[in-house]
Design a protein with these regions (language model features):
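C-terminal capping alpha-helices of c-type cytochrome domains
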Residues: 14, 76, 86-111
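N-terminal signal peptide c-region/cleavage motif recognized by signal peptidases
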Residues: 17-20
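Bacterial N-terminal signal peptides that target proteins for export
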Residues: 1-10
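C-type cytochrome heme c attachment motif
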Residues: 35-44, 54-55, 66-69, 94-98
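Sequence/structural segment immediately N-terminal to covalent heme-attachment motifs in c-type
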Residues: 25-45, 59, 108-111
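Gly/Gly-Pro-rich "capping" loops immediately C-terminal to redox-active cysteine motifs
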Residues: 27, 31, 46-73, 82-87
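Conserved amphipathic alpha-helical interaction elements at protein-protein interfaces in regulatory
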Residues: 3, 47, 70-73, 102, ...
């Protein structure tokens, strides 16, 4: 393999890695949807003060997207979250994941 071939392969691999890590979500749209749908339980920034409701801030995008898709499809059972996720579009889910992922996570404390 020549140096030119190696360079081409390296550039292609880097481009694919960057594309795979790129988010399809929109932060501002996610913020608006979070305020509308999620903030009452999870807090406006995803740092819920109620121990029964999980903190969403700082979570990985892919985890948040999968959880919401699974609540929506019924693969993940929760009588509170299923109806909350049901009306969300694919884009809503990506936007929410982008927004909550970008929020700084607060430390959980026991009281």
């Amino acid at each position: 393999m020549t140096m030119r071939n190696l360079s081409t392969i390296a550039v292609a691999a880097l481009a694919m890695a960057l594309a795979a890590g790129a988010s399809a979500g929109n932060y501002e749209a996610g913020k608006a949807k979070a305020k509308e749908v999620c903030a009452a339980c999870h807090g406006e920034d995803g740092n819920s003060q109620v121990p029964d409701y999980p903190k969403l801030s700082g979570q990985h995008r892919d985890y948040l997207e999968k959880a919401l898709r699974d609540y929506k499809s019924g693969a993940r059972k929760n009588p509170i979250m299923a109806p909350m996720a049901a009306p969300l579009t694919k884009q809503d889910i990506e936007n929410l994941a982008e927004y909550y992922h970008a929020q700084p996570a607060a430390l959980a404390t026991r009281q």
